[in-house]
Amino acid sequence: MDADKSEGCCSVQLIDGDGIYNVSRIDHFIKDVKLADCGLSYAVVSIMGPQSSGKSTLLNHLFGTNFMEMDAFKGRSQTTKGIWLARCAGIEPCTLVMDLEGTDGRERGEDDTAFEKQSALFALAISDIVLINMWCHDIGREQAANKPLLKTVFQVMMRLFSPRKTTMLFVIRDKTRTPLENLEPVLREDIQKIWDSVPKPEAHKETPLSDFFNVEVVALSSYEEKEEQFKEQIASLRQRFMHSIAPGGLAGDRRGVIPASGFAFSADQIWRVIKENKDLDLPAHKVMVATVRCEEIANEKFAHFITNEDWRKLDEEVQAGPVSNFGKRLTTILGSCLSEYDGEATFFDEGVRSSKRQQLEEKLLQLVNPAFQDVLGHIRWGILEKFKASFDKALGIGEGFSSASQDWFKACMTQFDEECAGAIIEQANWDTSKVRDKLVRDIEAHISSVRTSKLSELTSLYESKVHEALSEPVEALLDGANDETWSTVKKLHRRETESAVSGLSSALAGFDMEEETRDRMVKSLQDYARGVIETKAKEEAVRVLMRMKERFGTIFSHDSDSMPRVWTGKEDLRAITKSARSASLKLLSVMAVIRLGDEPDNIEKTLTVALLDPTKNDTSKKSITTSDPLASSTWDEVPSSRTLITPVQCKSIWRQFKTETEYTVTQAISAQEANRRGNNWLPPPWAILALIVLGFNEFMTLLRNPLYLGVMFVAFLLAKALWTQLDIPGEFRNGALPGLISISAKFVPTVMNLIKNLAAQGEDPPAANPENRRSSNNTSSSENPPDHKSSSKED
């Protein structure tokens, strides 16, 4: 049969006649009557009795249910099959009524009592009140119809590990004239006899009936004969079921109640155990039901939490960036979820409820922990960025590095702790120390990075200052090498190094660094300054040959007033050459080693003796040693670290220097000789004597013919004019061959120019006075200067 609903009542077949528990229908029934909302405020009433004894009729009148009743006109037969469940109408608290299949029915036969025992045990296990429906005329009879039923009830009660204390309400039907006060003692005596006759376990052999049951007796008139009186008695009995679980009520001292939300599952599990013919451990069953139901409630709340809009929105905000009041908001959401669990699981076993609550809380915390970690990550990142910006700004306005780093570190860590406190939720004692430690490491790493960068900048700054202060001055000093060069370099080095070290030390004072580190940086700057000089000295040493040639050329080709020399032949070329070479050798000796210390050396003397005065060197070799003082790769008492040019290299450089400057000296000698030749136009004496001897006849011929003298005079004048016009001495200063070529090119134009001038003068009137003639000659001369350039143009 299907579930039946009528106004104010709802019934369902809980277990069918074949003993099959109807899970789906009972679940729908529980939802329809909203049993889960009742908590512990509900009662279960069941009725037992012989078949066709009016059980369903009694329940329908007493509780307003709609169980199927037997139609007396159709004969007596089985009406209720299995176990039916209904909710009473108009009774508080919520009361569930179970109508059990009647006992001693012919449909099952005498031998099939298994279902009777199973249903009886089931009713005792889940009912708070058990109605025993019996006929009045059976009281006091040895073979009464209710005796097998009572034996069955007492026997199955022994199968409960820890039996509940159940109220057993005997309803005496069709009461006769015998007063209830007389019937009740007889009934109780019969009940006690049955109890005593039932075999019991050792633990309960002496246990009185009152430890298991509260026995109540009520009598009702015949429904068929005295219907009105029956209904009045039913109404009175109904009042006893109002607030039945309150202290003093019919079920006021019940124990081990299963919360209403677990009723369906509990009944299912109890029936399974009973069907398997196992002893029913109700306390263990209660724990089991609590475990399953609390687990279901916890899972349900966890699933609801996952889909909770507030949580989803909060999680999305966390993914997007920092969230304010995260801890407070999440605490509220978690608290609401756990409160809902507590509300639904409050009536289950406390140990199980607490355990499952803890598991739910752990699952929830495990779910929200990534969001919490993200929040901490946002906080850490934000604080780190704030520290970087604030720290850099503080350094930018000139605040000391150490004080700025310490002040902002403290401020940022305080802010981090405050923001972490705002992110903590009440339900968890999460540790933020790891994130805090990471933030500390990140800040310290940034401080270290900035410190390294700033120290590097300071080092680079002062190194650049040192390089700028030393590089060019040292180069200039080494270029003009003299006896005071290295002394001046040392003073410059000392002055600039001390200035840079002082500035660096002042700058480092704000870094709060160890003395050892500071000294190391100062030492590094000092070494750098020395390195600048050494590097520049090495660069100049590489160019020493070029510098020597430049110095030689400067001194050799210029006089004391720095004017270019004109080799007239009067200069002491040997002395000039020696002076220039001495100056070049001075440069070589200065560049041979680095002299930043106070250690003396004999390099200049050695070079002078070995290279400039070979005679003295030969004497020295004969008297002192037979070895060459420059035949070595090191200088005496000079370490190799200070050596720029070794003795062997000096000798090689000097040899190359002399070779490359030899041409300059040779050119000077040639210039002197050419100058001497240019200033002496008389032939040698032997040539004059030869001319006199050989030209005597020609001379005498001229004396005898005066006309030859006139011709010779004119030829002399013409030759002198050509001499002047052609500038023959000037042309031959450049050499004989170039002079001849130049003169030959200008000869014909010059002759033609002279002829034109003479012709022009012959055409002028002779009346001009001498002054006018001179003026005319001057004008003509100015118009046609005897310059070869004019002649060239004319040509």
From Swiss-Prot:
Location (main, coarse): endoplasmic reticulum
Disulfide cross-links: none
Topology with respect to the bilayer: Multi-pass membrane protein
Expression sites (tissue/organ): Specifically expressed in flowers.
Residues the entry annotates as binding GTP: G49, P50, Q51, S52, S53, G54, K55, S56
Localization terms from the record: Endoplasmic reticulum membrane
Molecular function terms, GO-annotated: GTP binding; GTPase activity
Coiled coil: 218-244
Segments in the Cytoplasmic topological domain: 1-682, 728-795
CDD domains in the record: GBP (cd01851)
Biased composition (Basic and acidic residues): 785-795
Entry-linked SUPFAM superfamilies: P-loop containing nucleoside triphosphate hydrolases (SSF52540)
Annotated segments matching region Disordered: 761-795
Keywords: Coiled coil, Endoplasmic reticulum, GTP-binding, Hydrolase, Membrane, Nucleotide-binding, Transmembrane, Transmembrane helix
Transmembrane segments: 683-703, 707-727
Domain GB1/RHD3-type G intervals: 39-254
Family classification: Belongs to the TRAFAC class dynamin-like GTPase superfamily. GB1/RHD3 GTPase family. RHD3 subfamily.
Primary role: Probable GTP-binding protein that may be involved in cell development.
Name of this protein: Protein ROOT HAIR DEFECTIVE 3 homolog 1
Organism: Arabidopsis thaliana
